[in-house]
Amino acid sequence: MDILKKRNTALCVMTLCILAAVLLGGWRGTTREYRAIQEAFTSGDSSPKQYLDTMLTRFAYLVKLADTYGIDTAEEMSLYKEMQNAYTLDMVTDLKKKERNLYAKVKQQSLNKEDMDYMERDHTMFVSSAASLTHIDYNQKALTYNKEMSRFPASLFCSLYGYEKALVFQ
């Protein structure tokens, strides 16, 4: 029991308590902010997820129509399936490019009136959703979040706990 009365023991215990408090406080703060930005991404009237889901749905319709007219859509289908699980900015950029290219290919086909009308409607909705992504309030929240989380000590806690930067659509 003499070990409890030594100064070095007290310093070690105090250091461990301070370290635990800093880690716990950092975890709580960064977790709260991370959850808030994730919530902003997935829910609400103008969440990015809503627009991305619309884009994916309209893209899937275009892929199905292209298949009907014998156009190879293996790459497009692969991207579509990959985006069912997660989004990255590169994927969204690739989705826009592939939709634009596939739309041009399908438009060159001899489409019946009904298919042409549906394709035009879906393309318009896709383009509208893609444009809306750049004008929603979420982007400002994401920029603020990324700025705050890139500063010390938040950056340390984000890397320690595996919190990634928020997607910003510009």
List the predicted regions and their residue ranges:
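A helix-centric hydrophobic-segment signal that preferentially recognizes long
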Residues: 2-170
